[in-house]
Amino acid sequence: MLIERTCAILGKMLEYCASLVALHSCVIMTTNTHITDDRILILDFGSQYSQLIARRVREAGVYSEMYAFDMSEEDIRAFNPNGIILSGGPESVHEEGSPRAPQVVFELGVPVLGICYGFQTMSEQLGGKVEPGTVHEFGYAEVDIQQRDQLVGNLQDRENQLHVWMSHGDKVSRLPEGFSTTASTPSCPFAAASDEARRFYGVQFHPEVTHTAKGAELLANFVHKICGCGGLWTPEHIIDLRVEQLRAQIGDEKVLLGLSGGVDSSVVAALLHKAIGDQLTCVFVDNGLLRLNEGDQVMQMFADNMGIRVIRADAEERFLTALAGEVDPEKKRKIIGREFIEVFAEEARKLDGVKFLAQGTIYPDVIESAASKQGKAHVIKSHHNVGGLPDDLEFELVEPLRDLFKDEVRKLGTTLGLPHSMIYRHPFPGPGLGVRILGEVKKEYADILRLADDIFMQELRASGWYDKTAQAFAVFQPVKSVGVVGDGRRYAWVIALRAVETVDFMTARFAHLPYELVDKISTRIMNEIKDVSRVVYDVSSKPPATIEWE
């Protein structure tokens, strides 16, 4: 009897444990399956800030995607958004053929937020009026809160004012029926308005830019309070989902990845290794145009520490030979790209049974490669890490980052255990030092530049300025300058230092480094590198200058 009762109790306990396991699996599966079910659709009218909207929404823990304003009704319904955001844009609603939101946007029954031009076209399409403003507002403005709705109800920068970023000429002069004013400026009576019954909201300013105080909170109010979205879009959930998707897509097949040591390819490598382990092989092409000890660092991180199979192709002599005598920047880029593809292809042919090619394509690449039917989309750019591979290398693509922004990729890398120094290091161009050596590329020049750049980075990190600048690097000038060392004359090369501050790399200003720091960097470079006699600091902003010199 006792034995029977004991067995019965044990049986119940096993059932309970099994139910917990099943529940745990269910929770994981639910999380993985539904982290994109709460979703915001962003219709892009051509604003330079449109990608920022998508990033801010995702920072609030909600999945979002951005499409051109002329998205079809069928596609909008298929996307099944919890809410829709209409971006700003450079057009005027008074211009013939200016873009309009698809009418279905206002018929779906979901909340809509119009920003700047998005607010104007929404107002006009719903029966309001838009007219050219007598005073154009560009830059900071103080907005007075007139009435608190769900969008601005809990926002308060000063007593009743918000510091916002304006960028508009036209303005809404008459609201559609059902709308009421929630905020204004002296020259813009309808800086924000809403129709709470239909859950339509509009703001004339840009909440997505960092210059707008409480802008992130405003967008969070829209996606959480108004649209009812949760906050499941997190690095941990994204990794779980990607691992599951990669295993389903790849199965037992082999994957090849061109590893550059940059942020995107590094995160792809770590993610694939977590998902499929030894099925991944990376090819690292060392072209002799990398930063000091960069090749060894990449091998140590991925091959030694993480156990990833990495093939290092030492191709320095090959690249330098191909570049010999060439001084045109664009031709240098093409030569470097061509040689990289050929080296990568040669290594790929040595491997048997590889079915998939992994790439570090990220969401801005996808957005910028999409053309709108009415020509409002961004200019197409080439972005694939190993684009242009020979036809006889037939791979299926694996792009696990193609719906993620750069900041999301960095967060994934941190969560996956990659070091901060790798994830948050400054951008490095694909052609490497090949476009930071002006004119012809020679090994002598590359060796000098590597040392100078390393000293620059050492001092930026030691002073705390590395993380305050978006990008910094040294540039080799193929001219010599006279210097004095002791009682002797030195006739040696010139090094330029470049450091910039920027958020989006579309515009940038030169970093205002302390004179004492610039002095220390300059002194070290000239003292420690005998082939350098002069150091200059680049004080050009973008525009008109570009960030890179070539």
Curated annotation (Swiss-Prot):
List residues of the Glutamine amidotransferase type-1 domain.
39-232
Q: In which pathway does it act?
A: Purine metabolism; GMP biosynthesis; GMP from XMP (L-Gln route): step 1/1
Active site positions: C116, H206, E208
Entry-linked InterPro entries: Class_I_gatase-like, GATASE, GMP_synth_C, GMP_synth_GATase, GMP_synthase, GMPS_ATP_PPase_dom, NAD/GMP_synthase, Rossmann-like_a/b/a_fold
- The highest taxon in the source lineage is Bacteria
Enzyme Commission code(s) on record = 6.3.5.2
Limits of the GMPS ATP-PPase domain: 233-425
Instruction: Give the molecular function GO annotations.
Output: ATP binding; GMP synthase activity
Tell me the CDD domains matching this sequence. GATase1_GMP_Synthase, GMP_synthase_C
Q: Which reaction does it catalyse?
A: XMP + L-glutamine + ATP + H2O = GMP + L-glutamate + AMP + diphosphate + 2 H(+)
Q: GO CC annotations?
A: cytosol
> Which residues bind ATP per the record?
S260, G261, G262, V263, D264, S265, S266
Going by the UniProt record, its keywords in alphabetical order are: ATP-binding, Glutamine amidotransferase, GMP biosynthesis, Ligase, Nucleotide-binding, Purine biosynthesis
**What does the annotation say about its assembly with partners?**
Homodimer.
Q: What does this protein do?
A: Catalyzes the synthesis of GMP from XMP.
The name of this protein is GMP synthase [glutamine-hydrolyzing]
Species this protein is from: Acinetobacter baylyi (strain ATCC 33305 / BD413 / ADP1)
Gene that encodes it: guaA
